[in-house]
Design a protein with these regions (language model features):
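Charge-rich, low-complexity N-terminal segments
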Residues: 1-124
């Protein structure tokens, strides 16, 4: 039997602002548009994590979805209702774009145990 994919979704909120400190206001506005507006702007994010694996013949599961949800909640708790620029050390030296944020989340989730093999992370 081929591996099975399971996806869990979770919602959370966070704020951020794009900008490069070495650029002036004009260049930041030209490159980042409204995402440069001070002090920040917020998003209601939807994180979808897809894991893959073989079905365990004893449990009938690839992963216990309660465990997967708990891990997602634990990881997201650090970011929920935070200003990514000001509150998160991950973005001290990089812009908190959706791409960079997804990379940080992937790295944190990849370090978790017992949630199957990470397949896809989607940040909406």
């Amino acid at each position: 039997m081929p591996p099975v994919l399971l996806t869990k979704r979770i919602e959370f909120a966070a704020a951020h602002r794009y900008g490069r400190p070495e650029w002036g206001d004009a260049k930041n506005r030209a490159v980042f548009g409204r995402c440069y507006n001070p002090p920040a702007h917020g998003h209601n994010y939807l994180l979808e994590l897809t894991v893959s694996g073989d079905i365990d013949p004893t449990t009938g599961m690839v992963v216990n979805l309660f465990d997967l949800k708990r891990v997602l909640l634990d990881v997201i708790e650090e970011f929920d209702h935070k200003n990514l620029n000001l509150d998160m050390p991950y973005f001290k030296d990089r812009i908190p774009t959706s791409e960079n944020f997804a990379h940080v989340l992937w790295t944190k989730l990849a370090a978790q145990r017992d949630i199957g093999a990470l397949h896809t992370l989607r940040l909406c």
